[in-house]
Amino acid sequence: MMRFLVLAGYFELTIYLHLSGKLNQYINMHYSYLAYISMVLSFILAVVQLYIWMKQVKTHSHLNGRLAKVTSLALLAIPIVVGLTFPTVSLDSQTVSAKGYHFPLSEGTDQAIQTSEGTTSQYLKPDTSSYFSKTAYEKEMRTAADQYLSQDSIQITNENYMEVMEAIYDYPDEFEDKTVQFTGFVYNDPSHANSQFLFRFGIIHCIADSGVYGLLTKGNTRQYENNTWITAKGKLVNHYHKELKQNLPTLEIESFTKVDKPENPYVYRAF
């Protein structure tokens, strides 16, 4: 009976996340079909377990002892309890501040920082190179970069956000002087009073590999507070950042508009 309840719980959890609109805060929505497959499988297995319990079918178990069985079921029930009872919190500039002002995957940054944190979190630039061979990655990004370089003005949307950002950081010199427009939340650079980053939190596969991606901005005529959402338009230049000890693609802002926070603040990488 307990196995049926646990499996039914996973089925109900997936339905809850879907109907409440919270599923997009846990996984890349391009892979949402996997969640639906797991939901169907959970339902089928729950029905099987209900049948076994009602018919008193003898089954073999590798778990010897009541404590082992209870412990295994309790561990399986933890995700259900967490998913149904814990509040969902959107990542924002407080998350960036909590990690400290350093970007572990930026070129020239001490990699020992990342090792000591035990994290592979990505900052500024999305990096999908680990999912391709070197040749395949270079070909993929070259094709993407050429697509956007051919445009007079690059409109960065929810759909292409991570692809464009990765291309900009891979080919900063080629994108210099290109006009771009995108929406993100403000993160004030604690090292420079008049500098602000414009970020979006992006998910490659699931929330575990999420990172904060965007551009340093210059030329703001108004200083916004952290977590203020704006749409900015301007030209890309390469700016040397002393703290990161590297050139960063930077948006020289020509116009900006304060906007409401999107219903879904996350962006996703499409492959």
Residue ranges and their predicted role:
Residues D209-R222:
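Beta-strand/loop nucleic-acid-binding surfaces
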Residues V89-P172:
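Membrane-interface segments at or immediately adjacent to transmembrane helices
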Residues V180-V186, N227-L236:
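OB-fold and OB-like beta-barrel modules that bind single-stranded nucleic acids
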Residues H241-V267:
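OB-fold/S1-family single-stranded nucleic acid-binding modules
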Residues A46-V48, I52-H102, S106-E107, Q111-Q114:
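Transmembrane alpha-helices and immediately adjacent membrane-cytoplasm interface residues
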Residues S38, G219-A232:
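Short nucleic-acid-contacting surface segments enriched for D/E, G, S/T with interspersed K/R
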Residues H192-I203, Q246-T250:
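Short aromatic-glycine-enriched beta-strand elements
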